[in-house]
Curated annotation (Swiss-Prot):
This is Guanine nucleotide-binding protein subunit beta. GO terms for biological process: signal transduction. Pfam families: WD40_Gbeta. It comes from Loligo forbesii (Veined squid). Signal peptide: none annotated. PANTHER family: GUANINE NUCLEOTIDE-BINDING PROTEIN BETA G PROTEIN BETA (PTHR19850). G proteins are composed of 3 units, alpha, beta and gamma. WD repeats lie at residues 54-84, 96-126, 142-171, 183-213, 225-255, 269-299, 311-341. Disulfide bonds: none annotated.
Length: 341
C-alpha cells in the first residue's frame, strides 16, 4: 500500500513538473519586460476623508454597495452596520444572532445584506421591508465549517466560501444549496465573482487559487505559487486576471488565459501577512491590507510600491474600492472604518 502511494506521489510530481514546463514554454514574455516602456504611476498619496465610528470591537469585514455611497461592515461586537459613506451616518444597525461574524456582503440591488461566520450559516437580511425595520429574510445552513466569505450574484443567488473546504451556490428564495464547489484541500478563505458573474475565483489555506464555473459547478483551473494560506482574492476589473494576498507576505497577480502567475508584489521590509486585496477601477493599482496596520498601494504593472495608507492602530482586516473608483474604505481591528481618496 505504501509503495503504491509512493509511486502515485512520484507520478503526480512528474505530471506537475510537466505542467510547470509547459507553462514556462508558453510564457513568451514577463510582466516586467512587457511594461518596460510604461511610465511608473508615481507616488500615490491618499488622505482619510471620513472615519466611521460606531463599532465596539474588531471589524472583520466590509463591502461597498453598488451605489458607491453606502457600505456594510461586520464586527465582533455582534453588529452589522450599514453606513452612509458621505455623511458617516448609520443607516441601519443590525444585531446578529451570532456575534462570531467573519464576512458580510451587500447585494447589487441594495435590497439585502448578508453575513456569516462561526455559526456556519449565511444569514440574509432584507433592508427594504414595508415596516422599515431590518429583518432576517433567510438563513442558509449547510456548510459544515465557518463561513469565510459571501457574495451576491443577484437578489436570489449568493455564493459562499467556507472552512469546510468548499464553496456553495444558494437559491435564497428556497434556502436550498444549488451547487457545491469542491477541490480545495484547506479552508477556503475568500472568493471573488467575475465581472460577468459566470465564474468565481477562490483562495484557500492549501495555498492555491481555483477558478470555478458557476453554471456547471466544475473547477476549471488551479493556480499555485503561494507558500502559505491565501487570505484574500479579487478579480481584475476586466475579468482576465486576479490578485491574491497571502500569509507568505506577498500579493500575486495571476493571468487566467496564460494559466499562471505573472506578477508578485512584495518588499524585504514587509514580513507580515495580507488580509485583504482590491484593485483600483482601472486595475493599475492593487491595494493590500496588512497585519502591520498598514495598507500598501502597489503599481500593478511595475510591481513596485506606490504608496501607503497609514492611520489604523491595529490590523487592517478588510478593504474595498467603490464601484465608481472614487474612494477606498479600510476596516480594522481598531474598530474604525476609514474612507480614503
Amino acid at each position: 500500500m505504501t509503495s503504491e502511494l509512493e509511486a502515485l506521489r512520484q507520478e503526480t510530481e512528474q505530471l506537475k513538473n510537466q505542467i510547470r514546463e509547459a507553462r514556462k514554454a508558453a510564457a513568451d514574455t514577463t510582466l516586467a519586460m512587457a511594461t518596460a516602456n510604461v511610465e511608473p504611476v508615481g507616488r500615490i498619496q491618499m488622505r482619510t476623508r471620513r472615519t466611521l465610528r460606531g463599532h465596539l470591537a474588531k471589524i472583520y469585514a466590509m463591502h461597498w454597495a453598488s451605489d458607491s455611497r453606502n457600505l456594510v461592515s461586520a464586527s465582533q461586537d455582534g453588529k452589522l452596520i450599514v453606513w452612509d459613506g458621505y455623511t458617516t451616518n448609520k443607516v441601519h444597525a443590525i444585531p446578529l444572532r451570532s456575534s462570531w461574524v467573519m464576512t458580510c456582503a451587500y447585494a447589487p440591488s441594495g435590497n439585502y445584506v448578508a453575513c456569516g461566520g462561526l455559526d456556519n450559516i449565511c444569514s440574509i437580511y432584507s433592508l427594504k421591508t414595508r415596516e422599515g425595520n431590518v429583518r432576517v429574510s433567510r438563513e442558509l445552513p449547510g456548510h459544515t465549517g465557518y463561513l469565510s466569505c459571501c457574495r451576491f450574484i443577484d437578489d436570489n443567488q449568493i455564493v459562499t466560501s467556507s472552512g469546510d473546504m468548499t464553496c456553495a451556490l444558494w437559491n435564497i428564495e428556497t434556502g436550498n444549496q444549488i451547487t457545491s464547489f469542491g477541490g480545495h484541500t484547506g479552508d477556503v478563505m475568500s472568493l471573488s465573482l467575475a465581472p460577468d458573474m459566470r465564474t468565481f475565483v477562490s483562495g484557500a489555506c492549501d495555498a492555491s487559487a481555483k477558478l470555478f464555473d458557476i453554471r456547471d459547478g466544475i473547477c476549471k483551473q488551479t493556480f499555485t505559487g503561494h507558500e502559505s494560506d491565501i487570505n484574500a482574492i479579487t478579480y481584475f476589473p476586466n475579468g482576465f486576471a486576479f490578485a491574491t494576498g497571502s500569509d507568505d507576505a506577498t500579493c500575486r497577480l495571476f493571468d487566467i488565459r496564460a494559466d499562471q502567475e505573472i506578477g508578485m508584489y512584495s518588499h524585504d521590509n514587509i514580513i507580515c501577512g495580507i488580509t485583504s486585496v482590491a484593485f483600483s477601477k482601472s486595475g493599475r493599482l492593487l491595494l493590500g491590507g496588512y497585519d502591520d496596520f498598514n495598507c500598501n498601494v502597489w503599481d500593478v504593472l511595475k510591481q513596485e510600491r506606490a504608496g501607503v495608507l497609514a492611520g489604523h492602530d491595529n490590523r487592517v482586516s478588510c478593504l474595498g474600492v467603490t464601484e465608481d473608483g472614487m474612494a477606498v474604505a479600510t476596516g480594522s481591528w481598531d474598530s474604525f472604518l476609514k474612507i480614503w481618496n
